[in-house]
């Protein structure tokens, strides 16, 4: 029996369809019409928040902004092969000079210091400029008597900068401590992914720690742990809901609810 032949009209209709009409959620694996994700880029089936740039998140969360330290540029301290090309690619993809946006913003009618790490820039990895901008964020917030809201998204320390990258964990943590000693509020919002040295330092030092649904949060990756202990880990291991159940975080908040939720928290602590 011969196969039916596609008509020229059918072929033309298929060719006219735009690409990437459908997208698969990396968490629930359900396919969705891309437009159904909405402006917030959230899976309509499980509420997983797709990874977005810092500037996109800024447009979702804040109504007024002033960027700080935008002129800081990453160098290549170790002359690491291919690093300058990766930096250029990250800058082109995000419009940032490194993997974090910092500044002053208004969220839910409340003024605060705001930091947003960008997973589209070398997976939000922590380099010298990222660490410096975060340190200055907390220092300026302390001087201005402002609360800090920090959206964390990172694969960890940036290997292309070696020990220079690892030093940022302690440097940012010291600035967080000084901000805390001044009696000021720090809200940490963990997004997908928050891993490695970022989790091991400032991401988990907030007075209030929130997370987006189903975000991957941890230190070492699943495969590394499974190979080390020679056991299969549970399906929801290192997911936001598991951390909430275990008491590591305070709440899981859907992306579209974050402006009002954060605004209420800021209002309570600045009244």
Swiss-Prot record:
GO terms for molecular function: acetyl-CoA carboxylase activity; ATP binding; carboxyl- or carbamoyltransferase activity; zinc ion binding. Its cofactor is Zn(2+). It catalyses: N(6)-carboxybiotinyl-L-lysyl-[protein] + acetyl-CoA = N(6)-biotinyl-L-lysyl-[protein] + malonyl-CoA. This is Acetyl-coenzyme A carboxylase carboxyl transferase subunit beta. The lineage of its organism: Bacteria, Bacillati, Bacillota, Bacilli, Lactobacillales. Its EC number is 2.1.3.15. It is found in: Cytoplasm. Acetyl-CoA carboxylase is a heterohexamer composed of biotin carboxyl carrier protein (AccB), biotin carboxylase (AccC) and two subunits each of ACCase subunit alpha (AccA) and ACCase subunit beta (AccD). Zn(2+) binds at residues 25, 28, 43, 46. It is an enzyme of class 2 (transferase). InterPro entries: AcCoA_carboxyl_beta, Acetyl_CoA_COase_Trfase_b_su, ClpP/crotonase-like_dom_sf, COA_CT_N. Belongs to the AccD/PCCB family.
């Amino acid at each position: 029996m011969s196969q039916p032949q596609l008509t020229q009209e059918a072929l033309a209709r298929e060719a006219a369809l735009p690409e990437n009409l459908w997208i698969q959620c990396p968490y629930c694996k359900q396919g969705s019409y891309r437009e159904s994700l909405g402006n917030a880029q959230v899976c309509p089936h499980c509420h997983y928040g797709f990874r977005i740039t810092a500037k996109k998140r800024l447009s979702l969360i804040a109504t007024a902004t002033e960027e700080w330290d935008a002129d800081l540029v990453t160098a290549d301290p170790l002359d690491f092969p291919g690093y300058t090309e990766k930096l250029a690619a990250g800058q082109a993809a995000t419009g940032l000079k490194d993997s974090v946006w910092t500044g002053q913003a208004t969220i839910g009618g409340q003024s605060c210091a705001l930091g947003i790490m960008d997973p589209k820039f070398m997976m939000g990895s922590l380099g010298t400029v990222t660490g410096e901008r975060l340190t200055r964020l907390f220092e300026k917030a302390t001087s201005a008597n402002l609360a800090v809201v920090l959206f964390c998204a990172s694969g960890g320390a940036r290997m292309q900068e070696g020990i220079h990258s690892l030093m940022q964990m302690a440097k940012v943590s010291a600035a967080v401590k000084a901000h805390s000693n001044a009696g000021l509020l720090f809200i940490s919002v963990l997004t997908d992914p928050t891993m490695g040295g970022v989790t091991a330092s400032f991401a988990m030092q907030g007075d209030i720690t929130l997370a987006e649904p189903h975000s991957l949060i941890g230190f070492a990756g699943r495969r590394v742990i499974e190979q080390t202990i020679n056991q299969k880990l549970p399906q929801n291991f290192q997911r936001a809901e598991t951390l909430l159940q275990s008491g590591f975080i305070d709440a899981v908040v859907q992306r579209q609810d974050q402006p009002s939720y954060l605004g209420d928290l800021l209002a309570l602590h600045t009244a």
